[in-house]
Amino acid sequence: MLQSIAFIPDGNRRHASSEGISFTQSYVEGTRKAWDVLNWISKYPNIDTVIFYTLSLKNLERPKTELMILLKIFEQELDKVMKRNEVIENGINIKFIGRRDVFSKGFQTRMEKIEKYTDQFRNKQVIIAIGYDGQTEIVDAVKHYTAEFAQGKVNPGELTVNELQKYLYADFKSPDLIVRTSKEQRLSGFLTYQSAYSELAFLDKYWPEITEEDIDAVVADYENRHRRFGK
């Protein structure tokens, strides 16, 4: 049963090129599409966790002008989150994962306010990976664990896979299914620790182009799979 679904919303820039529109317009469309996806998924009551790979640490190495446009769009969207009916009506709890210190204080404050406001909601959880990299998350978790070891708070002999997971950026259900758009077939550092047994689906469309029918199709395909978890 599908409970946790994750998205790598790839292809915004290529969508802009193919449609002859600006990067700004394409990214705005991509942001709107994320809300569309949340609305489409709401008809599946068993799906209570949705994860978006919004911006990787590697993405921050893109040209400065493009980053300024992208972060401005994100800031504008963050300012609207607490006013959106979908958040309240669906009881969405929002968490951000990633290296927050790479963003401005104002951007960090926006994320903190959203997390604090939506902490009252528990029906569904939306995880937004921003300034994120899976390998970096593991390194940060190990650093956190070793710091506690140095203080005598933990016993390395008792360390398990589940125990180390407690030191990751946030506690949420590992994705049952990861969906990537734009024809690319790789995870690009997304949820490296949590995706060990995730099923994968790749859509031959750019992120702004996906439809409700595409979401229905990947959900139906998942339900027909038999997960063995390495057994």
Specify the residue positions occupied by each region the protein language model found:
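Flexible, compositionally biased loop and terminal segments
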Residues: M1-K231
